[in-house]
UniProtKB/Swiss-Prot annotation:
Protein name (record): DNA ligase
E.C. number(s) listed in UniProt: 6.5.1.2
BRCT domain location: 600-680
Entry GO CC: cytosol
Homology family: Belongs to the NAD-dependent DNA ligase family. LigA subfamily.
Active-site residues per Swiss-Prot or TrEMBL entry: K117
Residues that span the membrane, as ranges: none
Group of enzyme by EC: ligase
Keyword list, A-Z: DNA damage, DNA repair, DNA replication, Ligase, Magnesium, Manganese, Metal-binding, NAD, Zinc
One GO-annotated biological process of the protein: DNA replication
């Protein structure tokens, strides 16, 4: 058993190593819950024995130093992190410390504000005469990285304050984050391009903000909530609640899930509610931030070296669970990437039963030293994706054997290859049935051709029975053949044939995305097809003038090289010709969203918010969303007072009822199509 001095040294080393990996390398090595527990242990050791406190202790600073590659800037006002409370006793102890700091009797009432703690990355935004002048990361709390060019790409951050008489100088603090649905789309695109997946939204956000190319940041669609306001003293609002109102009036998004609290009981009720309800939110939250409402009293309370005395983060309990690893299976993606997946005894996490989690790649398996039969600790990263966070080797049975990935593709028997610096292992056999199935699933997916009724099970039947050997073969199927397959009746077969016919009308951007070219996602496909009106002009540029492609906003060299390689492959040229023989043009047409957008010199739906509900006669939900956004409109997932139009199809449901109650205008598909075509 180490003595206190040895334990303090051990904790400092562990925490400093983890902080360096998180803040400087952007490669977290320790989950938050473990870091928080170890930090709390070190803090208590130093408080009980002050001689153990050293200058390099993580309790004496906020985080890691700025990384190389960006300019280091000094914060005008320190951007400190918050102390944590892990239970009600911790919260009560903080409240007593706060009362002593402002010289109030214990038990005195205090007005407090409770706000959700967004699981993202803190930013400091400086405005000069209402115009965004500088944006910086937290860094070590005193100095951060200047990332203004990246932050300008975040739509939720105004470049100019929406104020008639903006102050000469103001600084706003807030949290950049990636919403859950956006995170899922980013990982889906990365998977489609054969790239490693992000572990959770916060890590994805941190890595995005530190990209040297702002085009990459723009493509990942970060969001932002503002929560702190710093004005010259004479202009500062009287309270935190008023400051939040000021921020809303200035054009910032402020989290609506907040409350004025008269005592700790109010705070605990707020925290208890959101601990359960957080799973319904479109973003990750890991606790509640409690702040003293009166800003004059905040100044009186002041700061410790590390954090403000007038605020604390009340953390939700970390959702982790132990389980036993049963087996590791491999999945083969449409690009041939082999993804190992852990299968374990079911555990309950974040309101759902979980029994599988991706292991990402062979390096991750080696890092975990994973053995079959191991007791593993599982959590939902960002409350979304199950992941294996660690192994408990002390519980390893004597019969446990190391996990070994196969050397040959389990589908076709070809050698598996790991090229260059890639972490991914691939099957490089283009005729591999698993790659074909993945390519077909991608082609018919909602973001691509959106073929209703053609799911994974049916695709497996078609490939396994040799009925489909390429994408083009889908369009040679007939209703009689489909009707003879398992679980396919005459009606289902006829519906699928109609859906395949309808897919020929999808936009040029969707067709390009559906081809599954390495590195091309939905966003980049739209950008490319806005510049090149057909596949022939795109192929010519890809093979002879790649600089025309890299000149497109958001398109880099890797993507241009992927296009060149794809179009140079005779098999892919044959596929295009085969699909053209089945009615595909691979070009803009009069109803294409790209042409609709080009026809309107101004985005004539800009500033309007739409909500889609029910089934439309001809447009899929994703296609209607795409066309509205091309014309400048915004599509929201829920009805509110800010909604301008509800587009309602069959079986519209509760959204239609709510919209009618709020007096929101209702559109059918015909009226929507008319709005899309009408330009000012």
């Amino acid at each position: 058993m180490p003595d206190q001095s040895e334990r303090a040294t051990e904790l400092r080393n562990l925490l400093n190593t983890a902080a360096h990996a998180y803040y400087v390398l952007d490669t977290p090595t320790m989950e938050d819950a473990v870091y928080d527990r170890l930090y709390q242990e070190l803090l208590e050791l130093e408080q009980n024995t002050p001689s153990l406190k050293t200058a390099d202790s993580p309790t004496q600073r906020v985080g890691g130093a700025p990384a190389e590659g960006f300019t280091s800037v000094e914060h005008r006002i320190g951007l400190l992190s918050l102390d944590n409370a892990f239970n009600r006793d911790d919260l009560s102890a903080w409240n007593e410390r706060l009362l002593r700091a402002i010289d109030r009797p214990l038990g005195s009432p205090l007005d407090l504000v409770s706000e959700l703690k967004i699981d993202g990355n803190a930013l400091a935004l400086s405005y000069r005469n209402g115009v965004l002048e500088r944006a910086a990361t937290r860094g070590d709390g005193q100095r951060g990285e200047e990332i203004t060019a990246n932050v300008r790409t975040i739509s939720a951050i105004p470049l100019r304050l929406r104020l008639d008489n903006p102050p000469e100088w103001v600084e706003i603090r807030g949290e950049a984050f990636i919403p859950d649905n956006t995170f899922a789309e980013i990982n889906a695109e990365r998977e489609s391009r054969g790239e490693a997946l992000f572990a959770n939204p916060r890590n994805a956000c941190a890595g995005t903000l530190r990209q040297l190319d702002p085009k990459v940041v723009a493509a990942r669609r970060l969001d932002f909530f503002a929560y702190t306001l710093h004005l010259p003293t004479q202009e500062q609002p009287a309270s935190q609640w008023d400051a939040l109102t000021w921020l809303e009036n200035a054009g910032f998004r402020v989290n609506p899930n907040r409350a004025l609290c008269a005592d700790l009981a109010d705070i605990n009720r707020f925290s208890d509610h959101w601990e359960q309800a957080r799973h319904d939110l479109p973003y990750a939250t890991d606790g509640v931030v409690v702040k003293l409402n009166n800003l004059v009293l905040q100044d009186e309370a002041g700061f410790t070296q590390k954090s403000p005395r007038w605020a604390i983060a009340l953390k939700f309990p970390a959702e982790e669970a132990p389980s036993r690893l049963l087996r590791v299976v491999v999945q083969i993606g449409r690009t041939g990437v082999i993804t190992p997946v852990a299968e374990f005894e079911p555990v309950a996490l974040a309101g759902t039963s979980v029994s599988r989690a991706t292991l990402h790649n062979a390096d991750r398996i080696a890092e975990l030293d994973l053995h079959l039969g191991d007791t593993i600790v599982v959590r939902k990263a960002g409350e979304i994706i199950p992941e294996v966070v660690r192994v408990l080797p002390e519980l390893r049975p004597s019969s446990a054997t190391p996990v070994q990935l196969p050397e040959h593709c389990p589908e076709c028997g070809s050698n598996l290859v790991r090229e260059g610096d890639e972490v991914a292992t691939r099957c490089v056999n283009s005729s591999c049935p698993a790659i074909l199935r993945g390519g077909l699933r991608h082609w018919v997916s909602k973001g691509a051709l959106d073929v209703d009724g053609l799911g994974s099970k049916l695709i497996e039947q078609l490939v396994d029975q040799g009925l489909v050997r390429s994408i083009a073969d889908l369009y040679r199927l007939d209703a009689a053949l489909l009707g003879s397959l398992d679980r396919m009746g005459e009606r289902s077969a006829n519906n699928l044939i109609e859906a395949l016919k309808l897919s020929r009308q999808r936009s040029w951007a969707r067709q390009l995305y559906g081809l599954g070219i390495h590195h091309i996602g939905e966003v980049s496909a739209k950008a490319i097809t806005a510049e090149f009106s057909d596949s022939n002009s795109l192929m010519e540029a890809a093979c002879t003038a790649p600089e025309r492609i890299t000149a497109i906003y958001g398109i880099g060299t890797e993507l241009a090289q992927s296009l060149q390689q794809w179009f140079s492959n005779p098999a892919n040229q044959h596929l295009l010709d085969d699909l053209r023989s089945q009615g595909f043009r691979f070009a803009l047409d009069d109803n294409d969203p790209g042409r609709l957008g080009a026809a309107a010199s101004e985005q004539h739906l800009k500033g309007l918010t739409f909500v889609l509900t029910g089934t439309l006669p001809t447009l899929s939900r994703s296609e209607a969303k795409e066309r509205i956004e091309t014309c400048g409109g915004k599509v929201s997932g829920s009805v509110s007072k800010k909604t301008d139009y509800l587009v309602a199809g069959e079986e519209a449901g509760s959204k239609l009822t709510k919209a009618t109650t709020l007096g929101i205008k209702i559109l059918d598909e015909d009226r929507l199509q008319a709005m899309l075509k009408d330009s000012p």
